């Protein structure tokens, strides 16, 4: 039986989807390995926990857990400005938080794994604190002088780190990293990365750039990427941003992101029912925090809806659209239904244009589609013809099977 590979991420709640994309990319390319994922964060929502648990259900080779970190001490060390948050500093604590582990792999959450990580994991770290890839961008701008490093000193990109946790604990490196970050908070431009390179100087092992191929590399052809194991989307513009310039790299990210979206589809009905319950409870209790939470979850669901989501009632577009229409008709949320549901309506129509009714299936496809259209038409003032009333009576009798009524 193969040993388990522990892999760490350090993120905030806003980055969970990107982290999950990274996780899925690992698992799709390393199904024969035993992997334990550890997520270091200051908070995690119920929906994020459910998404991580669903990933566990899909991939049998992985266990996923999260560790809640007290962020206050790290916030004081965060340099003002920039797009990098204090959560990246959580990696300092890995060795001391997990004394049962002697070795681990740390990954930033803005990367994808496009091959086997087993050769990387098996690298010998004897005599080294960590291993990483030479940072090409830093070499180009001659940044070492600012950090008082010589040209012979190694400077790595800290987005991919193979860690010798045993030696990091023994030599109390966490304490030294925190102290360095505090002292040089105004000098060090890349904070935790600078601290790691300075404190671990002389004990950093260089590894091939196939394990941390950054956007500083200038060639982004499919042929160039065929041998790359880890693609790291450095910089403030990411592949999920519309203005991201490198199409080949963006397509690779979208490939793995589509996998996580399919897993997320399995949770849509549960999230919609919870949204309705939260809005109902907030109305009864006048609790604004509950209402804000429900509104945030509703926006999360709407943002996820696209023609790629199944048209089904259960965990699909019709069920989500029906739930939102119900919220509007019960005045649990305010707004124009045509405007709010435009995105879902468009997605539903797009699927209908591409597929026949027989392709959709009766129970999960056509019946859900009919119920969604019925409920949408109920919002119209003139929806009171004899035929319409018969349809209303029919669906009212079947209402319990649609969970909402």
Residue ranges and their predicted role:
Residues 1-11, 21, 163-264:
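A glycosyltransferase accessory/donor-loop signature
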Residues 25-33:
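Short, acidic, metal-binding catalytic loop of nucleotide-sugar glycosyltransferases
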Residues 339-364:
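Asp-box/WD-like beta-propeller blade repeats and closely related beta-sheet repeat scaffolds
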Residues 55-97:
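Active-site-proximal specificity loops/subdomain of glycosyltransferases
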Residues 274-287, 321-333, 369-382, 405:
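Well-ordered alpha-helical scaffold segments within catalytic/enzyme domains
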Residues 111-146:
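Conserved donor-nucleotide/metal-binding helix-loop-beta segment in metal-dependent transferases, i.e.
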Residues 104:
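Short aromatic/hydrophobic "clamp" motif used to bind/position activated sugar donors
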Residues 226, 262-314:
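Internal amphipathic alpha-helical repeat/solenoid segments
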């Amino acid at each position: 039986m193969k040993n388990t590979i522990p892999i760490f991420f350090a993120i905030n709640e806003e980055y969970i989807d990107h982290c999950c994309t990274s996780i899925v990319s690992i698992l799709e390319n390393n199904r024969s390995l035993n992997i334990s994922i550890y997520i270091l964060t200051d908070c995690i929502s119920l929906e994020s926990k459910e998404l991580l648990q669903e990933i566990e259900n899909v991939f049998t080779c992985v266990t996923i857990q999260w560790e809640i970190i007290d962020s206050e001490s790290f916030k004081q060390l965060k340099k003002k400005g920039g797009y990098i948050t204090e959560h990246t500093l959580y990696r300092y604590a890995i060795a001391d938080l997990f004394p049962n582990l002697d070795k681990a792999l740390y990954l930033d959450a803005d990367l994808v794994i496009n091959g086997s990580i087993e050769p990387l994991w098996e690298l010998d770290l004897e005599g080294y604190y960590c291993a990483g890839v030479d940072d090409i961008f830093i070499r180009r701008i001659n940044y070492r002088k600012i950090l008082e490093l010589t040209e012979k000193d190694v400077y790595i990109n800290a987005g991919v780190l193979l860690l010798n946790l045993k030696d990091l604990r023994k030599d109390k490196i966490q304490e030294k990293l925190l102290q360095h970050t505090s002292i040089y908070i105004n000098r060090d431009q890349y904070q935790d990365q600078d601290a790691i390179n300075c404190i671990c100087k002389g004990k950093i092992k260089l590894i091939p750039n196939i394990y941390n191929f950054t956007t500083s590399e200038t060639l982004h052809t499919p042929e160039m990427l065929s041998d790359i194991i880890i693609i790291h989307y450095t910089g403030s513009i990411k592949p999920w941003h519309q203005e991201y310039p490198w199409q080949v790299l963006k397509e690779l990210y979208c490939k793995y992101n589509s996998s996580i979206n399919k897993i997320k589809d399995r949770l849509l009905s549960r999230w919609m029912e919870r949204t309705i319950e939260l809005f109902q409870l907030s109305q009864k209790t006048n609790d604004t925090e509950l209402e804000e939470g429900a509104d945030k979850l509703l926006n999360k669901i709407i943002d996820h809806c696209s023609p790629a989501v199944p048209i089904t009632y259960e965990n699909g577009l019709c069920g989500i659209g029906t739930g939102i229409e119900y919220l509007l008709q019960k005045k649990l949320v305010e707004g124009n239904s045509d405007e709010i549901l435009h995105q879902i309506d468009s997605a539903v129509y797009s699927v209908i244009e591409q597929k026949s009714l027989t392709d959709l299936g009766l129970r999960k496809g056509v019946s859900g589609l009919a119920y969604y259209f019925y409920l949408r038409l109920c919002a119209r003032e003139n929806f009171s013809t004899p035929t319409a009333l018969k349809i209303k009576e029919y669906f009212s009798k079947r209402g319990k099977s649609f969970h909402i009524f």
